[in-house]
Amino acid sequence: MEKYENLGLVGEGSYGMVMKCRNKDTGRIVAIKKFLESDDDKMVKKIAMREIKLLKQLRHENLVNLLEVCKKKKRWYLVFEFVDHTILDDLELFPNGLDYQVVQKYLFQIINGIGFCHSHNIIHRDIKPENILVSQSGVVKLCDFGFARTLAAPGEVYTDYVATRWYRAPELLVGDVKYGKAVDVWAIGCLVTEMFMGEPLFPGDSDIDQLYHIMMCLGNLIPRHQELFNKNPVFAGVRLPEIKEREPLERRYPKLSEVVIDLAKKCLHIDPDKRPFCAELLHHDFFQMDGFAERFSQELQLKVQKDARNVSLSKKSQNRKKEKEKDDSLVEERKTLVVQDTNADPKIKDYKLFKIKGSKIDGEKAEKGNRASNASCLHDSRTSHNKIVPSTSLKDCSNVSVDHTRNPSVAIPPLTHNLSAVAPSINSGMGTETIPIQGYRVDEKTKKCSIPFVKPNRHSPSGIYNINVTTLVSGPPLSDDSGADLPQMEHQH
């Protein structure tokens, strides 16, 4: 980690912090996620190892790319490329919602990235605006895989996890331990309306209140989930809310088009078995009308290539700067040597000092013409110029090799932004920027940004119930995170 210069704190949370750093060799700006002393905290170690393992396996244009992993003094360090903009930033800048074309491009990439994870039997489990990054070119990146995991084998159950309540599917809220990919699809449905309208769809302030919001919009839970709710000791003495009159999506958001409402409804089906797969969502009319999917797929590849070129140009610029600094230092060194040499030959002392004060070229001509032997000596004493080549190979400081030679994309795990050090970029055409009024997003999210390590506990307008659920699990602990050895990088082409 000595090769990185710390430029300041980006954010911090319960499990660690993220720092903005510069690679001293290449000048490249990166984000380094530093976990707490994971050897002393089993939960921190579990989260760190899970994120490292999954990010090493997954390589996709819409997923954050892990550049390097180090372990120093019982702490894990994850090195990512630096990006300081998320969809949450867009929603705070444009509280009335984003433009149709922007939402269309964002959702296409979000579903594309989640679908890639699902094709490798991995569920993210914490999809939300602050975990979706956006590069300067508009490339979306899913990040923060600390709660992601592989799908359970038949008969195996999942352990409970702490994720953002507003985007939890009903099966998670009632304590079902046999959930699957459908929980990510539910979160997509929540994002659909939030990006268009600028407000969260189900802003519950407790698990039972969250269920109330869901049932008010979508109706009663399926029988299996009702049974799980009644058997869950956390809800002992509590009944599911009785819904006298529903407020469906089309009534709540009359300005949204039918195709948008239909996309959201499909993702938010109360029965997880009836929610579509990501591949089906990409063929929805919302993406297929006017040839958007085919046209944007080509545009996306150009955006990815542009980001890669920007990284390459940045490296070359830094290298040229460092070589210029070396050249300047050599000139100063030569001047010093020439001045020292005049002490041995007083007859030419005044002449040499006069030439040194002149231009660099004049000084070199004088040396070549009048002091050939001295110039030869200086030539031998020069430091050779070594070209600095941006390194693409990854080295684990804990003797774990990582080989990543592909062009990395630009991403950073999100944490609370320190706006004094990091100013988010604003994409044009995003929407109409207004001065935020006092409300749930201003009260809770203007603390500079969200902290993904510390899950939000914001209040809902209804606030009818106030009971949190914790799933009771009797199954064995996860085996995929307990290993102390860092897994080898596996590229997915």
Swiss-Prot record:
Query: Does Disulfide bond show up as a keyword for this record?
Result: no
Give one Pfam family, short name only. Answer: Pkinase
Give one GO biological process term: sex differentiation
Catalytic residues per the record?
D126 (proton acceptor)
Annotated segments matching region Disordered: 363-384
> Which tissues and organs express this gene's product?
Expressed in testis and kidney, and at lower level in brain and lung.
Q: What is known of its domains?
A: The [NKR]KIAxRE motif seems to be a cyclin-binding region.
This enzyme catalyses: L-seryl-[protein] + ATP = O-phospho-L-seryl-[protein] + ADP + H(+); L-threonyl-[protein] + ATP = O-phospho-L-threonyl-[protein] + ADP + H(+)
**Keywords attached to this entry:** ATP-binding, Cytoplasm, Kinase, Nucleotide-binding, Nucleus, Serine/threonine-protein kinase, Transferase
Superkingdom of the source species: Eukaryota
Q: Which gene encodes it?
A: CDKL2
Task: Please state every residue range assigned to the domain named Protein kinase.
Answer: 4-287
Q: What is its main location?
A: cytoplasm
**This chain belongs to which protein, by name?**
Cyclin-dependent kinase-like 2
Q: Which organism is it from?
A: Homo sapiens (Human)
Q: Could you confirm whether the keyword Transferase appears in this record?
A: yes
Gene Ontology molecular function: any one = cyclin-dependent protein serine/threonine kinase activity
Family that this chain belongs to: Belongs to the protein kinase superfamily. CMGC Ser/Thr protein kinase family. CDC2/CDKX subfamily.
SUPFAM superfamilies from the UniProt entry: Protein kinase-like (PK-like)
